[in-house]
A protein has these predicted regions:
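Small-residue-rich hydrophobic transmembrane alpha-helices
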Residues: 44-104, 141-160, 267-331, 364-386
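Transmembrane helical elements of multi-pass membrane transporters/channels
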Residues: 12-31, 133, 167, 196-200, ...
Length: 451
């Protein structure tokens, strides 16, 4: 990504990444559609009642893996291949540690987590079985996300998509087999999702071993190195925490919504599935912008960093406007993919949420790109703070207004968080670019003086 038209390169990189994100969300959407249509609205509520804690835990895993890929992209752009390989190995060790710790903790604390979320009694058992299986599958989630992050860091976003596509097809059949044939209910949906995730991760590993000589580790690369661990943690942990901090606000939001009853839990679950699916293009272009800027930082090309930010925001805002219009006018129709026509109250509430969200969807085009570029330039702490502002905004709306305005307050919690975070991260991103530009100019001046 250090040569050629920035917009063209970013779109080429983002497209397979987008398809991969869509397929990853398809896992969840297929689960929800089959559960909602076959098992009913309460079963759908069971699957969705813990979505915020899944976002917190799995978001931390995915964010950490994405962060671990940033130094890899930087050293790949700087053509320091041996150092890049050192970081790949040390990142893998950190991922293994995270997988063991999170799987053990989350599985043991699952009942307490559901109590904190105020899960209604009539859906508790199904929610518990679904969430526990998802937690037990954390190692597979980390396996796929770390390997796909490494492949993307060296410019290959196509391969992870291909393997994810294959596993997505399998996920459909596993869903139907586990739920319809084996009668495993909500637990069957979780088993199908985790199995598909495991297959995509294993396929990525086989591809790297057989085809990606660039990523093969030599004996000297397979040692734990303090400087590598330190830099990886400095990038990965803040990025993971960024997702988790945002998720804490979502947990407060979901807990407040759960108290409104199973009808609104079903409506919220339905709206969240649609939201997560339509957010995939934002995530794809933001990740593309981050990798683009990180590689060009390593290559010392500050002008291309600025162009990368402009291109990313332009594409993101443009998509946000189009998607927002769709949510405003087609929310009710989209909700019917998950809930039958007879669940009128659920459909109306879901459509209301999507309609309110649609008016502010454009802001995500700025927020996600600016945050990921800030992270890609190495200022992960500042990117994390944008997540803190989101958490605070959601918490204030839910704790301060749900008691008075009910579900209407829930409908405006996300938008308040997005606007608040954007007001912080966009000027911060511009500051980070200016600082990076000065740093690169200083390095170039020292090199010229030395020569």
């Amino acid at each position: 990504m250090i040569k050629g038209n920035p917009l063209k390169l970013m779109l080429q990189f983002a497209f397979p990444l987008l398809l991969g994100n869509l397929l990853q969300q398809t896992y969840n959407i297929i689960d929800a559609a089959i559960v909602g249509q076959i098992l009913g609205a309460k079963a759908l509520a069971s699957v969705g009642a813990s979505s915020s804690i899944q976002f917190l835990v799995l978001g931390f895993c995915m964010g950490s893996c994405t962060g671990f890929g940033v130094p890899v992209a930087k050293y790949f752009g700087a053509e320091k291949i041996e150092k890049m390989r050192d970081y790949i190995f040390n990142g893998a060790v950190l991922c293994a540690g995270i997988a063991v710790i999170l799987t053990a903790l989350c599985s043991v604390l699952c009942p307490q987590i559901l109590h904190i979320l105020s899960v209604p009694e009539d859906i508790y058992d199904n929610t518990y079985s679904y969430l526990l299986i998802i937690f037990l599958g954390i190692p597979f989630t980390i396996l796929y996300n770390y390997l796909s992050s490494i492949l993307r860091s060296v410019g290959d976003s196509r391969t992870p998509f291909i393997f994810l596509a294959l596993s997505a097809v399998l996920n459909i059949f596993l869903d139907l087999f586990c739920i319809v044939v084996l009668k495993l209910g909500c637990a069957g949906a979780a088993i199908a999702t985790i199995s598909a995730q495991a297959i995509s991760g294993i396929l990525c590993l086989i591809f790297i071993i057989r085809k990606m000589k660039l990523l093969w580790l030599k004996k000297e690369n397979r040692t734990i190195k303090g400087d590598a661990v330190k830099e990886l943690l400095a990038m990965g942990m803040p990025t993971g925490l960024q997702f988790s901090i945002t998720a804490i606000g979502s947990m407060v939001m979901q807990s407040a919504n759960n108290r409104l009853g199973s009808t609104y839990v079903s409506a919220f679950t339905t709206a969240m599935k649609i939201k997560q699916f339509t957010m995939c293009p934002f995530d794809a272009i933001a990740t593309s912008a981050s990798v683009f800027c990180s590689q060009n930082l390593g290559a010392g090309q500050s002008d291309r960093i600025k162009k990368g930010l402009r291109c990313g925001i332009t594409v993101g805002v443009g998509y946000g406007i189009v998607a927002g219009i769709l949510l405003i006018f087609a929310g009710h129709t989209l909700s019917m993919l998950f809930v039958g026509k007879s669940a009128v109250a659920v459909l109306d509430a879901s459509a209301k949420y999507l309609r309110c969200m649609g008016f502010f969807y454009w802001s995500l085009g700025i927020l996600n790109v600016a945050r990921m570029v800030t992270q890609g330039l190495g200022y992960s702490g500042r990117a994390v703070f944008s997540g803190v502002t989101e958490m605070i905004a959601r918490t204030v709306v839910c704790l301060g207004f749900v008691g008075t305005f009910g579900f209407t307050a829930i409908c405006f919690a996300d938008q308040t968080a997005w606007i608040t975070a954007t007001c912080y991260i966009f000027p911060t991103c511009l500051w980070c670019i200016r600082k990076s530009t000065k740093m690169l100019a200083s390095i170039a001046a020292r090199v010229n003086n030395a020569s």
